[in-house]
Amino acid sequence: MATRLLRTNFIRRSYRLPAFSPVGPPTVTASTAVVPEILSFGQQAPEPPLHHPKPTEQSHDGLDLSDQARLFSSIPTSDLLRSTAVLHAAAIGPMVDLGTWVMSSKLMDASVTRGMVLGLVKSTFYDHFCAGEDADAAAERVRSVYEATGLKGMLVYGVEHADDAVSCDDNMQQFIRTIEAAKSLPTSHFSSVVVKITAICPISLLKRVSDLLRWEYKSPNFKLSWKLKSFPVFSESSPLYHTNSEPEPLTAEEERELEAAHGRIQEICRKCQESNVPLLIDAEDTILQPAIDYMAYSSAIMFNADKDRPIVYNTIQAYLRDAGERLHLAVQNAEKENVPMGFKLVRGAYMSSEASLADSLGCKSPVHDTIQDTHSCYNDCMTFLMEKASNGSGFGVVLATHNADSGRLASRKASDLGIDKQNGKIEFAQLYGMSDALSFGLKRAGFNVSKYMPFGPVATAIPYLLRRAYENRGMMATGAHDRQLMRMELKRRLIAGIA
């Protein structure tokens, strides 16, 4: 019972904003600092200082991240000034903590202060990191970004999770509307839509399904009558400590809920298939990921088969020790079943929560010991997927990274493999409003590059934004190079204007 309560509380904590005392703003000390976590397309652990070539350096990878005048040539000075200010503010840990405290305090209960706070956030962080309040506004933002910069858009309805069937159904309709908005755009303007399974299936059910899948892996004689055909979701090195005893079978009601969840994801996939819009399925932490992988792969088998290119993409988190093994198993099975498969490769999120849960159970963290191990795993997986995509197979690859070294390695690998950078099989992605220098550099090097563009009503998106800011502080701190380039370009324009 104690273990069950522990896990239940862990789930509850993992999907809420950090809790601070309502008495006053948080005090940040070395002992209370949270290990940074990077979510969504920014999913990656904090990066070490990178080597940035001088303007005179020549690199055979074709990726120039040093010439700020060329990188930011498409950005108006007013936008560049605002971006610089917002990114500097987002890199200040105490400011992020204060904003998180304000949004979770009683100040938001008063209409006057709530309106002031929402108005301030909308005109700064929201407008910088979000694409609009609804799918139509987001589609227009995608259009304007592409026309100004040549960067594509990934539309993301910014909802984290749902607790009941009504919310799940409502979220499904929002995802359908997102697909319709993407379809209304020229195909050159967008790359995909993104869905979170936690938004269309209750977290409690995903946990139950994950427990049962783990036990099936541990005990081959343990059969799951409701299970659809899928690819492997575990490898020999996968963490199984979440499930230490045989779980109870799904109740009749839970089976109906699971069938409804399958129906929602299939309806979304069907709409994507009809609209020729790729669907990227986001990853979560390891307590839920087996169920998400299962649903992603079962959907891929249904909707990717007999296609030249995949519709459904699953996400691989390279900061997990078993990422490489699970990726290879999925690819092997996809090839065996002749199913084109898409993969979005990220570094990972939830570092501190993964470590905390493992430690509380007396187990080793599923996350790599060092950041360099994570970088190595990411680059190995990236190389493997690029080789698969280059041999004429139906694999699709989205390299979601803010790491310039990975960008350079991929650029060199593409050249070595003779990959057509514009064939649509390989693309890069970064969060909207972040790592613009890398995005522009990759675009200038000839790659397809997309921005992960969340949208939603301001009040709904604020918790999403705060969680992103809270978890992205580590990456913001290592984004000093981007901010330095922005300052240099602003200074250059100022001097040029005076002269």
From Swiss-Prot:
Effect of a null allele: No visible phenotype when grown under normal conditions. Proline hypersensitivity.
Catalytic reaction(s) noted: L-proline + a quinone = (S)-1-pyrroline-5-carboxylate + a quinol + H(+)
Keywords, ordered alphabetically: FAD, Flavoprotein, Mitochondrion, Oxidoreductase, Proline metabolism, Stress response, Transit peptide
Class in the EC hierarchy, top level: oxidoreductase
Tissues where this protein is expressed: Ubiquitous. Highest expression in pollen grains, in the stigma and in developing embryos.
Protein's pathway: Amino-acid degradation; L-proline degradation into L-glutamate; L-glutamate from L-proline: step 1/2
Any one Gene Ontology BP term: cellular response to hypoxia
One GO CC term, this protein: mitochondrion
EC number: 1.5.5.2
Chief localisation class: mitochondrion
One Pfam family of this chain: Pro_dh
Molecular function per GO: proline dehydrogenase activity
SUPFAM superfamilies assigned to the protein according to its UniProt record, in alphabetical order: FAD-linked oxidoreductase
InterPro entries: FAD-linked_oxidoreductase-like, Proline_DH_dom, Proline_oxidase
Requisite cofactors: FAD
S-S pairs: none
Transit peptide, residues from-to: 1-72
Subcellular location: Mitochondrion
Entry's induction text: Down-regulated by salt or drought stress. Up-regulated by proline, hypoosmolarity or rehydration. Activated by BZIP53.
Protein function: Converts proline to delta-1-pyrroline-5-carboxylate.
Protein family (similarity comment): Belongs to the proline oxidase family.
Protein name: Proline dehydrogenase 1, mitochondrial
Originating species: Arabidopsis thaliana (Mouse-ear cress)
